[in-house]
Amino acid sequence: MLTKQDLQQIESLGISEAMVEHQMEQHRKGFPYLKLQAAASIDNGGIMAPTVKERDAFLAEWERYQAEGRKVVKFVPASGAASRMFKDLFAFLDAPYDEPMSAFEKEFFDNTRQFAFRKLLCKSCKADTQSSVCDLKEAGRYKEIVKHLLGEEGLNYGNLPKGLLLFHNYEDEPRTPLEEHLVEAALYAASNGEANVHFTVSHDHLQLFKDKVAEKVEKYEKAYNTRLHVSFSEQKPSTDTLAVNPDNTPFRNEDGSLLFRPGGHGALIQNLNDVEGDVVFIKNIDNVVPDNLKGDTVTNKKLLGGILVHLQKRTFAYLSVLDEDGYSRKQLDEMVYFLEKELCCKREGVSELDDNALVEYLRKKLNRPIRVCGMVKNVGEPGGGPFLTYNEDGTVSLQILESSQIDSNNAEYVKAFKEGTHFNPVDLVCGIRDYRGNAFHLPDFVDHNTGFISSKSKNGKQLKALELPGLWNGAMSDWNTVFVEVPLSTFNPVKTVNDLLRPEHQ
């Protein structure tokens, strides 16, 4: 089925023929739904809710860890284009009317003075039309304002990445999300006066990000007395996936070549694997707030970091005991209790295993990457949720699931997903080294059966696209996972331009 030209194309992308065959098989078979035990909650022990005393202890733990000079990295997926933020404004440009009609359009134009980009927008409008934004509104020339915001003749926001848009107003100058993440790194992810920030970006925007960092980094280093090491990576072509026709034959471009598409954020497990660090914080590019509201974010990030360090210490100590061979059955039982109670990983019949089998089981389960994930109370926002799920080896563990991973024909599962008490704001702290200080090879811990297939089109032709297991979903399926309740104030994503008018972004 694959031609000589196909094989050359595959090789040039760094993809093996076996991987392409595997992807075609996944298209044919589809992906199994996950088997759920329950939505994770505080009541069933799936989500931690630390007491004030415990919080203080974990915060102190994190500050001690920072003082030890460990390498902490802030990892920010930032390849997302801003075009979706402006979907309603693009629709307004194409609308048969010239003045704002919808509630969204009216809210935008009524509040143009509130946006952090207002001065740049006004400057662009004046340079081209000799009229300010206010003048253009009074003259009913609303679409010209939008063109200057979104188009190349103006700010070009319709084609820029989210990370480079002006989000927040300050007395000296407005800030982009990129800058807010640099500040966050200095506030909770620094060690010995140095902080590391890694952005994953698209190839087309890489230079723009580098230019912005070069322009701004010194300002924030001085303001926070912290040396900022900023690095970038792109999604690897070798993680692209083959698109197929509805009949599962390879979809071909007009020139006859195979169509490969980016495999979604799950591909970033390869980028994360390349990061050199002891602990990695992960948060999306658009979930930032101005300085006056950063307090909750900083405190809760430190809290998650402290919980991670606390759990790592105990895990590493147990693994060292197993290496010495002088352990007792009582110690093994204590490790099982820790694994089940603290790391929420359970399997029936473990107590019946003999010592050798139990040690093998404990080694396998304890010696894994660990992540501590913040979870916020469910207020109906779209996104994944925390669940207790059954794994192929018979264990039950914590997973972050998307709706696409749940059988929509199973009423009990759908109810559990809809009625879950918490949801995933993408707020993770990850331990990516083992108890001997070696980096884990993260692709070894991916569940390749947790991707999904979506329907897309190209040039008017339908196709099936293969999404890799999501970064915080199947790509981290075989990690030790702990969920911790964090306040809703730490979750402030910007999905539309009008979200910037919310109090938390003003």
PLM region spans:
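Long, compositionally biased intrinsically disordered regions
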Residues: L2-I42, L353, V359-L366, R371-C373, ...
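C-terminal, active-site-flanking charged/polar segments
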Residues: V280, N300, Y390-P425, D434, ...
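Conserved catalytic alpha/beta cores of large enzymes that bind or transform nucleotide phosphates
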Residues: S131-G140, E153, Y157, D286, ...
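Domain-scale recognition of functional cores that engage charged ligands
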Residues: Q8-I10, K29, Q37-V379, L388-I400, ...
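Short amphipathic beta-strand starts and helix->beta connectors
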Residues: L182-A186, N410-Y413, L468
